UniProtKB/Swiss-Prot annotation:
The keyword ATP-binding does not apply. Residues 208-1063 form the TBDR beta-barrel domain. One of its GO terms (molecular function) is siderophore uptake transmembrane transporter activity. It is a multi-pass membrane protein. Belongs to the TonB-dependent receptor family. Hemoglobin/haptoglobin binding protein subfamily. The lineage of its organism: Bacteria, Pseudomonadati, Pseudomonadota, Gammaproteobacteria, Pasteurellales. This protein is subject to phase-variable expression associated with alteration in the length of the CCAA repeat region. This mechanism is called slipped-strand mispairing. Addition or loss of CCAA repeat units would change the reading frame and result in introduction of stop codons downstream of the repeat region. This may be a mechanism of regulation and a way to avoid the immunological response of the host. GO terms for cellular component: cell outer membrane. One of its GO terms (biological process) is siderophore transmembrane transport. The keyword Transmembrane applies. This is Probable hemoglobin and hemoglobin-haptoglobin-binding protein 1. A motif (TonB C-terminal box) lies at residues 1046-1063.
Length: 1063
């Protein structure tokens, strides 16, 4: 920590606090009840019609949680080590709109950036995503598929929405951020900490009245987002209700230099990793929160809640890397159109009892059913008029004149056939060459008319080349349409070829006549990938609390338990369909013989276009649904106990314990099967005489190719071995010591642990390929964390300064490691390189934090309303391992010069650079106006503190290529050769200034406006920099030059404003 520099502002606040202590009143030495570090979210809302002896306490509680209340002050005696609570009022004042804004002015916590799919959870104390707990109203939120194998295979290609779902900020009453091990509250997953949300309730608004109405409109320029929120709360006799309906409609976040391209055409042509502008997406969120309560008397309450939200992203992956740049452009070959969705629906029923008994003062029983679906749909097709599949240079179009359908060109005339030598060629109505643009494959007997879209009672003008007597015509003829019926009852039309009456050597002659269609297919083939990650959670939960005195000690007891069942599954749906369909593919379809055989009767094929008639290419083809992961049901049984003990006026203890028993029950759904090739042979190989691959089966060998009974038997044997149950048990604890030696100093110590049970994909995922295979591991251990923390808080009235130091130790980190080369088929010499998730690493993070707030009015009465704030987090950490990481051993055999790099402790990319946040603000005594200035200062991420997981394939090295040792030159990154394991992209130091103000001209009206990045600073955050990929097709830049990195920069100067009416 030699580089740490103490803040001048923090020193000033400390000096001011200490200077004022001399004038402070003497301590009362009265014991102060302190809330426990609760293992689960407990309700703070009590019924408003409590017994008389509780009315004052209830009133105080309700005033504290009043969403529209004015107080933002922190009760130092209630603040826990490493814990921050953010109220709804503070979020509204800061104009927070998403998870990024939630932690914008916090230090030591950031969001994980994923590019197209947005933020994915949080990064705290060196770990991120699934290693940081997220809960909403007591329910854990969806986890990502976290296995490194899945990330290597699928995540870098944008085929899955593999993110942690977020919450609508307008629904949040409080957000509690805990840094450090926290399984006590969040259960499995909270190694680095947790973020726990509690949603609003009708009682938060109905303090002194029976109704509340609010309408809020907002707008922010960084993504052109429009906000509309309607809030209704009411109470009638024994019933109360709350409805919050929120709509957000905007587009992608505008990076710095967003308007780099001069026009829309240039914008659409800037494709691939070198694109410097954020990809165009339309992003909407619709959220509805409804809570209905029934309280027949002061001791009983029933309630039901619905929390339903959908986040949808539509747009084009212009930076998508998988396209033939050298020979094509997006205007001819198309782009990747995406439609991602994150849906969350939670229905909750609860019963509360407020009768005081020897066992509880308050008891709550709740049942919740939560369904989360993260969908990623991509359509790869060309959607413009310039696409090859819909090319129509002559502008041919269909018109109806005087009861006759005619095909005319772009000039409004008909094509003409001109005799050129021994042949005829088409000219358009202005005499221009059109022959190369007209299809030769639209004979009358191969084309049927869709009578559902055209009026088949009218005639159609066709082009006749030879009549039924084989005489040349090269002219138009108006024909009647004969109507037929398809098996589904729909009508179609046909125009039969005329046949001659005089037979010839090959039968009766028939005319040669056709439709004059454009030469292209008339549609673009849409390659659709529609993939869902589903999480369905059901929970029954019992919470009890009791306050009592025992001898000379005071106790606040919390205890209870829960049973939770979660089904996690994946559904892949891949199919091809027609997109950008033009009239000649829409109004007509193919008539062809079965198998395309000549001489057989032609029948209608509505799923085949006229252009695809020869090969029988279908417009729509569906291979059905499948999955790469077996569905797994997780059952979790939990018991918890917590007691806050006040031993004396200056000594208190937090004693908290939780027991988790997690069971994984894998299953298999035949409706969405796992492809057999992913499972067959992984445990039980095929026999030497089994032919698994090949065009033929030699004599004496057994046919075990795909879909044979032999293959299916091996698949079933391996599946049975894969479907093994696993379970994990863990004892979590959180022990705290609170010392109050004076009325201006509080000392707190915390010792806590946490665990993360492996996710189902880390245990059960399988994949098989000669270049890269993954085997399951049902013997994985749970990851664990232990946190030690000490905090010193100096305070006076509403001002405080907290200095804390922490250490977090992680064990049994799960990592993908090379296991061995293994034969799948004993009769084959091919060995598959198998990787497996194993417990490898351990890590340690140390750091210090400062949090302070100085109310200037506490020092000088004339400065009443002014306040200063300062926060800082400084942390360092490394991942340690007693043996080489995966793949290093083979690499070092040929490249021993890199031994020192491969053997050193690995930096932790999830650690944020040193961050400070300064706050200067003023609130008028009338509370009618105020403003805040936030200054965020972030240090550069040092090269030695970053890690590039692909470094062994990028440095200059020797490789064994097909048995020959060759030297491979170094990959260039940003114009320089990669020489070590340092991260390729890092942020420089930056300072950002935000200014936010509010104004209440009348009681019911509030205006809020802010300028963000006031100085228009160009900067790249560390979380955006580390999201840039070297492999895959998304979130890429041109590694050699760094072109495309501008796409990842934060927005320049931007503005937000909102207006809220309240009644």
């Amino acid at each position: 920590m030699t580089n740490f520099k103490f803040s001048l502002l923090a020193c000033s606040i400390a000096f001011a606090l200490n200077a004022s202590i001399a004038y402070a009143a003497q301590p009362t030495n009265q014991p102060t009840n302190q809330p426990t570090n609760q293992p689960t979210n407990q309700p703070t809302n009590q019924p408003t019609n409590q017994p008389t002896n509780q009315n004052s306490n209830v009133s105080e509680q309700l005033e504290q949680i009043n969403v529209s209340g004015s107080s933002e002050n922190i009760n130092v005696k209630e603040k826990k080590v490493g814990e921050t609570q953010i109220s709804a009022k503070k979020l509204a004042k800061q104009q927070a709109s998403d998870s990024r804004d939630l932690v914008r002015y916090e230090t030591g916590i950031t969001v994980v950036e994923t590019g197209r799919t947005g933020a994915s959870g949080y990064a705290v104390r060196g770990v991120d995503e699934n290693r940081v707990g997220i809960m909403v109203d007591g329910l854990r939120q969806a986890e990502t598929l976290s296995s490194q194998g899945f990330k290597e295979l699928f995540e870098g290609y944008g085929n899955f929405n593999n993110t942690r779902n977020s919450i609508e900020i307008e629904n949040v009453k409080t957000a509690t951020i805990t840094k450090g091990a926290d399984s006590l509250k969040s259960g499995s997953g909270a190694l680095g900490g947790s973020v726990i949300f509690e949603t609003k309730d009708a009682r938060d608004y109905l303090i002194d009245k029976d109704y509340y109405l609010s309408y809020k409109r907002g707008y922010q320029t960084m993504n052109n987002q429009n906000l509309k929120t309607l809030t209704l709360a009411g109470r009638s006799k024994k019933f109360d209700i709350l409805i919050i309906d929120t709509t957000r409609d905007g587009h992608e976040i505008e990076n710095y230099d967003y308007k780099i391209y001069p026009n829309k055409q240039a914008d659409l042509r800037a494709v691939g990793p070198t694109r410097e502008k954020a990809d165009p997406y339309q992003i909407t969120r619709q959220s509805t929160l409804i809570k209905l309560g029934f309280q027949p008397n002061e001791n009983h309450r029933l309630s039901v809640a619905l929390d339903d939200s959908t986040l949808e992203t539509k747009g084009i992956d212009l930076s998508y890397a998988l396209r033939p740049y050298s020979t094509a452009n997006n205007e001819k070959y198309g782009e990747r159109i995406i439609n991602d969705q994150s849906k969350r629906k939670n229905i909750q029923f609860s019963y509360e009892n407020f009768s005081q008994t020897p066992f509880w003062d308050h008891i709550k029983l709740s049942y919740s059913s939560q369904k989360i679906t993260n969908k990623a749909r991509s359509d790869e097709y060309c959607h413009q008029s310039t696409c090859n599949g819909v090319s129509n240079p002559q502008g041919l179009h269909l018109v109806e004149e005087k009861g006759v359908y005619k095909i005319k060109d772009k000039y409004g005339g008909e094509l003409e056939s001109k005799e050129i030598g021994w042949s005829h060629e088409f000219k358009n109505s202005k005499g221009e060459d059109a022959d190369k643009d007209i299809s030769q494959r639209s004979s009358l007997d191969s084309v049927l008319i869709n009578c559902e879209k055209l009026d088949c009672s009218k005639k159609f003008r066709i082009y006749q080349e030879y009549d039924e007597n084989s005489s040349e015509k090269y002219t138009y003829d108006d024909r009647e349409i004969e109507v037929g019926t398809l098996p589904n009852g729909k009508k179609y039309g046909k125009i039969p070829l005329k046949k001659g009456k005089t037979p010839s050597w090959n039968g009766f002659p028939q005319e040669t006549a056709r439709f004059l269609f454009p030469k292209s297919y008339g549609y673009s083939t849409d390659f659709v990938n529609d993939r869902d990650l589903n999480t369905h959670t059901q929970q029954i939960k019992l919470d009890l609390d009791k306050e009592f005195h025992l001898w000379h000690t005071q106790h606040q007891l919390k205890y209870g338990g829960l049973y939770e069942k979660t089904l996690k599954s994946m559904v892949n749906h891949q199919y091809n369909t027609a997109a950008n369909v033009q009239w000649w593919a829409d109004y007509f379809f193919c008539a062809r013989a079965k198998g395309g055989n000549l001489g057989e009767k032609k029948t209608p094929h509505p799923n085949v276009s006229v252009a695809g008639c020869v090969n029988g290419t279908p417009l729509h083809s569906d291979i059905g649904k499948d999955t790469y992961l077996i569905p797994v049901t997780t059952k979790n049984n939990v018991l918890y106990f917590g007691d806050n003990v006040q031993l004396t006026s200056w000594l208190g203890l937090d004693l908290n314990y939780r027991y988790d028993h997690v069971k994984y029950l894998p299953g298999y759904d035949e409706k969405t099967p796992v492809p057999g090739g992913l499972i067959a042979g992984i445990f039980v190989p095929f026999n030497e005489k089994d032919v698994v691959y090949g065009a033929y089966v030699p004599s004496g060998y057994k046919d075990c190719r795909y879909n044979t009974e032999c293959y299916k038997k091996n698949f079933e044997e391996n599946l049975a071995l894969l479907l093994r149950k696993t379970d994990y048990k863990h004892h979590s604890y959180n022990l705290g010591l609170n010392l109050d030696p004076t009325d201006w100093l509080r000392v707190q110590l915390k010792y806590a642990n946490a665990f993360r049970a492996p996710t189902s994909d880390e245990i059960y995922m399988t994949f098989k390929h000669p270049d890269f295979s993954i085997g399951p591991n049902t013997n994985l251990k749970a990851e664990t964390a232990k946190t030690k923390e000490v905090a010193f808080t100096f305070y006076k009235e509403n001002s405080y300064l907290t200095l804390s130091a922490f250490q977090s130790d992680y064990r049994n980190f799960i990592d993908l490691v090379f296991e061995k080369n293994k034969q799948i088929d004993k009769g084959s010499a091919i060995e598959y390189p198998f990787y497996q998730n194993q417990n490898r690493d351990q890590a340690r993070v140390r750091g210090i934090e400062i949090a302070s707030r100085l109310e200037m009015g506490d020092l000088f009465e004339k400065l009443q309303g002014f306040h200063l704030g300062y926060k800082l987090t400084y942390q360092k950490g490394r991942i340690k391992d007693n043996k080489l990481r995966s793949g290093y051993a083979e690499f070092l055999k040929l490249n021993p010069q890199y031994t020192a790099i491969a053997s050193q402790d690995q930096p932790m990319n999830a650690l944020q650079p040193t961050t400070s946040v300064y706050n200067i603000g003023y609130d008028a005594p009338s509370k009618k106006w105020g403003m805040d200035v936030y200054i965020t200062d972030v240090a550069a991420k040092k090269a030695k503190d970053s890690f590039n997981s692909q470094w062994t394939s990028m440095v200059k090295r020797k490789e064994n290529i097909y048995g020959t040792e060759r030297t491979v030159p170094a990959t260039q990154a940003n114009g320089k050769d990669v020489k070590d394991s340092r991260g390729l992209w890092r942020n420089n130091r930056y300072t950002v200034i935000d200014t936010i103000a509010y104004w209440k001209p009348i009681k019911n009206l509030t205006f809020t406006a802010g300028v963000y990045n006031l100085t228009n600073k160009k900067y790249l955050t560390w979380d955006s920099a580390r999201s840039v990929r070297h492999l895959g097709t998304i979130n890429r830049v041109e590694t050699a030059t760094g072109k495309g990195l501008n796409r990842f920069y934060a927005p320049g100067r931007n503005y937000r404003m909102s207006v809220q009416f309240e009644f």
